[in-house]
């Protein structure tokens, strides 16, 4: 009996150690898995430094979104830290509620053919995002996502017109706070990218006195509704 108990205890310890190893191996691959999914949605290169989570928070470090081909700026979007606050069980529901998303140290690159043109890097990216949401599986078509608060801290932006090749460093925006951002249809990640990115872009364009360009951008995106 004693030998049996020792063997059973040893087996339990081995199972626990195996579980811990599998967990850490899976966690180490998580940034690449999320980056790959985002890259497929946006059709651009995406890199993520690290991802950590608790039962109520997801923390993403050093997210970098590249530009589509034939654009000169290195990045379309970068953020040093993203904090997503919502119980993990919320993501299993049909109607998903996220209490708050905070983005710290944000950079956005805006690139257009000319001051008069509206064809640019974000036209391409948002078109790709809209297509990904439209093509989501039927099982996710009825899902809704509500972000109660979206907070951006310390936003820097560059503006480049390809016609003159000059990079303009726009004034830093200390903070943007958006509330009650909602969307329906598509999986959670596609909805977050489409609704949250759209609202962030709109507010940044307004703050940088570029709202007219923003409105024209959304007119060019098939199947999208202008962000209100």
Question: Which residues does each predicted region cover?
Answer:
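Secondary-structure transition motifs
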Residues: 65-85, 89-180, 186-228
């Amino acid at each position: 009996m004693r030998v049996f108990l020792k063997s059973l205890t040893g087996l339990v310890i081995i199972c626990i150690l195996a579980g811990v190893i599998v967990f850490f191996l899976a966690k180490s691959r998580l940034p690449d898995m999320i980056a790959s999914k985002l890259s497929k949605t946006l059709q651009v290169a995406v890199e993520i430094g690290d991802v950590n989570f608790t039962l109520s928070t997801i923390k993403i470090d050093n997210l970098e979104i590249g530009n589509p081909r034939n654009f000169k700026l290195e990045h379309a979007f970068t953020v040093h830290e993203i904090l997503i606050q919502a119980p993990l069980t919320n993501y299993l529901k049909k109607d998903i509620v996220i209490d708050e998303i905070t983005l710290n140290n944000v950079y956005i690159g805006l690139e257009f053919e000319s001051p008069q043109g509206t064809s640019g890097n974000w036209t391409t990216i948002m078109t790709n995002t809209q297509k990904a949401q439209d093509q989501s599986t039927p099982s996710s078509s009825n899902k809704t996502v509500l972000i109660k608060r979206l907070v951006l801290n310390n936003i820097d932006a560059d503006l480049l017109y390809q016609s003159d090749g000059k990079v303009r460093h726009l004034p830093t925006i200390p903070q943007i706070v958006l509330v009650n951002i909602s969307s329906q249809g598509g999986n959670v990640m596609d909805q977050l990218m489409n609704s949250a990115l759209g609202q962030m872009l709109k507010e940044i364009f307004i703050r940088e006195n570029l709202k007219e360009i923003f409105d024209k951008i959304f007119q060019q995106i098939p199947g999208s509704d202008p962000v209100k």
